[in-house]
Every structure is written in structure tokens, then in C-alpha cells.
């Protein structure tokens, strides 16, 4: 997920109450998932900086790009689902609908996230490249 999406959800969770009157942000699962999402964003950033550094140095890199892409797209997919789950049924409201949390961005990202595991090479291909390049495992196909 992008940091603006995390920020938008945090704002929503701080100012929205569950049906029992407790703010969403007071739910320990919500807090843990927000922290995990932020940590994953920083891990993605580290992967990207490392890959960019290797490219700038002219170093031939192999699996670093695949690792960056795989981690980023799989994290985005996971976190987008988390945000929908944490918002409840309202999280499924479309972009622009009046009652949609975060202006409907949760649904927008949830529907877009699976595509990121396909373009630039599917997650399966990335896993195979990492298995071959980093672990020395034989090709699967």
C-alpha cells in the first residue's frame, strides 16, 4: 500500500466508531495491521533503494528486482484486503460514494491490488526467478 492510503485509513480509523461506540483505532488488530503495513512500506523502500543503488553502480543484479517487485505487490494485495476487512462492509463502497470510507479508495485499491501481482511478471515467475537465482534450485518448467 502507499503511505497516503495508510494515512487516509489512519485518519478514518481515528474518527470513526464501530457499532458498539468504540473508535476503530482502539481495536488491537487494527493497530497491529497498521503498524505491519508501515513496516512493510519501509521494507519495500529498502528493497527499492538497494536495487537502484546496484543499478547506479553498474552492478549486474539478478534477483533483487524480482524480490522488490514480489514483496511490494504481495504486500499491497495483503494490506488492501486488510483495510477493506477493518472498515467492514462500508469498505466495499465504490470510489466517490458518499458513505464510502476514505472516499472509496479502499475499494479502489482492493480491486487494483491483484493486478500488481501480474504486470511486470507474475508473482509465480518472480518466485521461480528467486528460487533459481538465490537458492540455486532447478527450473520448475
What residues fall within each predicted segment?
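Alpha-helical interface subdomain recognition
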Residues: 1-141
Amino acid at each position: 500500500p502507499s503511505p497516503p492510503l495508510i494515512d487516509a485509513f489512519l485518519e478514518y480509523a481515528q474518527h470513526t466508531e464501530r457499532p458498539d461506540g468504540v473508535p476503530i483505532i482502539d481495536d488491537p488488530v487494527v493497530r497491529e495491521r497498521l503498524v505491519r503495513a508501515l513496516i512493510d512500506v519501509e521494507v519495500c523502500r529498502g528493497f527499492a533503494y538497494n536495487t537502484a543503488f546496484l543499478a547506479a553502480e553498474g552492478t549486474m543484479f539478478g534477483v533483487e528486482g524480482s524480490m522488490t517487485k514480489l514483496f511490494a505487490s504481495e504486500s499491497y494485495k495483503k494490506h488492501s484486503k486488510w483495510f477493506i476487512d477493518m472498515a467492514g462492509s462500508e469498505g466495499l463502497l465504490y470510489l466517490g460514494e458518499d458513505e464510502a470510507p476514505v472516499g472509496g479508495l479502499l475499494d479502489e485499491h482492493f480491486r487494483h491490488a491483484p493486478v500488481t501481482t501480474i504486470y511486470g511478471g507474475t508473482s509465480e515467475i518472480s518466485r521461480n526467478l528467486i528460487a533459481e537465482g538465490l537458492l540455486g534450485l532447478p527450473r520448475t518448467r
